[in-house]
C-alpha cells in the first residue's frame, strides 16, 4: 500500500470530525429568588444524604438498607442502566474502523461430464482445492457528524438511565419511610382506642350501677353502650389498616409480609428535624428527575443531528489484504490488497428521511416541554412541602391545647357525673370530643412527620448532580 493511499485514507478519516456539537437548549425558565412558603429561620439546606437518620428511628435505617438490597423496582432500574451502557458501546463502535479476519478452504469436484465455464474443475482435473486468508477493514467517514451524534445520544441516554435509577431510589426510600411511619401511627391509634374503650367501659359500668340504684335511666345505659360498641368497632378497623400498612411496607422492601417484623416503638419518640430548603436555584442540581429530563433532552437534540446527517451522502472506505492458493502450504505466498470507496447518496425515498428529521425535531420539542415541567414540578413540590410544614406546625400548637382541654373537660364531667352534679349527656359529649382530639393528634403528628419526608424527597434526598442545569438562574 503506497504512502499516497495511506494519506488519502487518513485525510478522509480526519474529515469525520466535521460535525459540531450543538449548544445545549435553554429551558427559558428563571428560578425564583426565594421560596414563598419558607418559615423564618429555615433558609439554609443542611447535608441530607442520610435524611432518615434525623427521625431517630434506628429500625428505619435497617428497613431502608433491606429495601435497597431487595427492591424489584430498583433492581429493574439498575438493569436498565446496564442496557444503556451496552447501547452506548454499540453506538460508539462505528466511530472506529471495523476489522475482520477470514480464513477459508474449499474443494470443487466434478461428478460427471466436463464441467462448464463457471467451474474451476475440468475433465482433466476434476477436483480443485482452494485455500484463502485475509484481513479486511471498513469505515464510514463521519462527514456530517451523524455517527458522533448517535454516540452522544447514547451517552446522554445512559446518563438519563442513571438519573432514573436515582429517582427510583429516592422514591423507594421516601415510600418506605412513609409506610413505616404509617405503621407506627396506626399502632398508636390502636393503643389510644384500647384506652378509650377501657374508659368507655368504665363509664358504662358506672351508669349500670346507677341504673340499678335507680339514679340513671335505661336511655343513659343504652347511650353509653352504643359508645362502647362504637369503640369496639374501631379496634378491628385500625387493626386492618395497620396490617395493610405492613403489607405495603413489606412490598416496598421486597420481602413477603410474613418475613417482616416491625418492633414496637412509642410513636411520640419520633422527631422531625428542622430542615432548610436552600435557594430555589440550588434545587436544579439536587433533583435526579430534573437531571433525567435534561439528559433525555440532550439525547433528543443529538438525534436531530443524526436525522439531519442522514439526508446527506455517505462515504464508506474499505481495504483488504488477502492471499490464496490451491495448496494449504502456499496460502500466504500470494498476497494482494484491495482498496475501495463507496459513495451512497439518497435521491428518492418518498420523504422518509425528511419525515425522520421532522419527527426528531418534534421529539426534541416534546422533551423540552417535559424538562420545563420537571423544573416547575420540582419548585411546586418544594413549595407544597414547605407550606405543609408551616401549616402543620401551627396546627400542632393549637392541637396540643385542644387535647389538654378535652382531657380536662372529660375528667371534670366524669367526676361531676359520679357526684350526681352532671348529666350523662355531658359525659358522652366530652368523651367523644376527647377521643376525636386524641385521634386527630396522632394523625396530625403523622402528617407532620410525612411532611418532613416529603420535603426531603422534594429536595432530592441529598442527591447531587455533577452537571449544570439548563434553566436560567438569573
UniProtKB/Swiss-Prot annotation:
It is found in: Cell outer membrane. GO terms for molecular function: efflux transmembrane transporter activity; transmembrane transporter activity. Induction: Expression is iron-regulated and under the tight control of the PVD-specific PvdS sigma factor. The keyword Hydrolase does not apply. GO terms for biological process: pyoverdine biosynthetic process; transmembrane transport. It is a lipid-anchor. GO terms for cellular component: cell outer membrane; efflux pump complex; membrane. SUPFAM superfamilies: Outer membrane efflux proteins (OEP) (SSF56954). Gene3D superfamilies: Outer membrane efflux proteins (OEP) (2.20.200.10). It comes from the Bacteria. Disruption phenotype: Mutant shows reduction of extracellular PVD levels and accumulates PVD in the periplasm. Mutant lacking PvdRT-OpmQ secretes PVD and can import ferri-PVD, but has an approximately 20-fold increase in the amount of PVD present in the periplasm. The pvdRT-opmQ deletion mutant also accumulates newly synthesized PVD in the periplasm. Mutant accumulates unwanted PVD-metal complexes. InterPro entries: OMF, OMP_efflux, RND_efflux_OM_lipoprot_NodT. Residues 1-17 form the signal peptide. A lipid is attached at residue 18 (N-palmitoyl cysteine). Keywords: Cell outer membrane, Lipoprotein, Membrane, Palmitate, Signal, Transmembrane, Transmembrane beta strand. Coiled coil: none annotated. Part of the tripartite efflux system PvdRT-OpmQ, which is composed of an inner membrane component with both ATPase and permease domains, PvdT, a periplasmic membrane fusion protein, PvdR, and an outer membrane component, OpmQ. This is Pyoverdine export outer membrane protein OpmQ. It comes from Pseudomonas aeruginosa (strain ATCC 15692 / DSM 22644 / CIP 104116 / JCM 14847 / LMG 12228 / 1C / PRS 101 / PAO1).
